[in-house]
């Protein structure tokens, strides 16, 4: 499996994401935001956490209009896989690849801690390494992670089994406790928690490993 990790000015989790992909058996190529084309043969694109372009204007808004994001959108529209984590989730909502928006945390404070997530569905390449209903421990680190969408969108996400993860005790005010969602074809995942920070026992947790291993296995079998 070949993964491309996009790097913006202000990204700070691109190395962590690359290491998690590599540990799961993927080949990784870093892609700069000014690039216009993806590497040949890319199976999945990872958009990492951080503070792209300093979070100016709106989190993820400037990054979403960078040259590489046109190729990311085209990849997704062709049925390619994309994962956006934290700031990457914000970028995916700004590009329109995922619905909703990430607002300022309800408590108006930056939150950095490990939280309990409930796996809502195992019916995707990202989550098939878990069982629906599992509780996993994954770190969060964000100031604008409060997921919001109108009631109709929330109902559609829930009705189509597109809510991937929810918080067991919502830290940021996210509507319907949503921590991560899937696209309509289930090949784009956006999530605020950081599974790449829970993919090595030396870092204090391994609950994120199953996501990367399942994804690598699913794409290798295609």
Swiss-Prot record:
GO terms for biological process: 'de novo' IMP biosynthetic process. One of its GO terms (molecular function) is ATP binding. InterPro entries: Class_I_gatase-like, PRibForGlyAmidine_synth_PurQ. The active site is at 86 (nucleophile), 194, 196. Residues 3-222 form the Glutamine amidotransferase type-1 domain. Pathway: Purine metabolism; IMP biosynthesis via de novo pathway; 5-amino-1-(5-phospho-D-ribosyl)imidazole from N(2)-formyl-N(1)-(5-phospho-D-ribosyl)glycinamide: step 1/2. It catalyses: N(2)-formyl-N(1)-(5-phospho-beta-D-ribosyl)glycinamide + L-glutamine + ATP + H2O = 2-formamido-N(1)-(5-O-phospho-beta-D-ribosyl)acetamidine + L-glutamate + ADP + phosphate + H(+); L-glutamine + H2O = L-glutamate + NH4(+). It is found in: Cytoplasm. Its EC number is 6.3.5.3, 3.5.1.2. GO terms for cellular component: cytoplasm. SUPFAM superfamilies: Class I glutamine amidotransferase-like. Keywords: ATP-binding, Cytoplasm, Glutamine amidotransferase, Hydrolase, Ligase, Nucleotide-binding, Purine biosynthesis. Part of the phosphoribosylformylglycinamidine synthase complex involved in the purines biosynthetic pathway. Catalyzes the ATP-dependent conversion of formylglycinamide ribonucleotide (FGAR) and glutamine to yield formylglycinamidine ribonucleotide (FGAM) and glutamate. The FGAM synthase complex is composed of three subunits. PurQ produces an ammonia molecule by converting glutamine to glutamate. PurL transfers the ammonia molecule to FGAR to form FGAM in an ATP-dependent manner. NCBIfam families: FGAM_synth_I, PRK03619.1. Part of the FGAM synthase complex composed of 1 PurL, 1 PurQ and 2 PurS subunits. PANTHER family: PHOSPHORIBOSYLFORMYLGLYCINAMIDINE SYNTHASE SUBUNIT PURQ. This is Phosphoribosylformylglycinamidine synthase subunit PurQ. It comes from Roseobacter denitrificans (strain ATCC 33942 / OCh 114).
């Amino acid at each position: 499996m070949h993964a491309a990790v996009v790097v913006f000015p202000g990204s700070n989790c691109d190395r962590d994401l690359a290491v998690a992909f590599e540990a799961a058996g993927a080949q990784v190529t870093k892609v700069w935001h000014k690039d216009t084309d993806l590497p040949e043969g890319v199976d999945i694109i990872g958009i990492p956490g951080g503070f792209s372009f300093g979070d100016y204007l709106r989190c993820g808004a400037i990054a979403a209009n960078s040259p590489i994001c046109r190729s990311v959108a085209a990849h997704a529209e062709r049925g390619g896989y994309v994962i956006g984590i934290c700031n990457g989730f914000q970028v995916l909502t700004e590009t329109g690849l995922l619905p909703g928006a990430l607002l300022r945390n309800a408590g108006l404070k930056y939150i950095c801690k490990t939280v309990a997530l409930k796996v809502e569905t195992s019916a995707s390449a990202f989550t098939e390494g878990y069982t629906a209903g599992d509780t996993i421990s994954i770190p969060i680190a964000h100031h604008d992670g409060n997921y919001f969408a109108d009631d109709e969108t929330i109902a559609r996400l829930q009705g189509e089994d597109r809510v991937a993860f929810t918080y067991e005790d919502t830290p940021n005010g996210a509507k319907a406790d949503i921590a991560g969602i899937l696209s309509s074809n289930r090949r784009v995942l956006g999530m605020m928690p950081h599974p790449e920070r829970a993919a090595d026992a030396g870092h204090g947790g391994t609950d994120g490993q199953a996501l990367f291993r399942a994804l690598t296995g699913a794409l290798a079998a295609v």
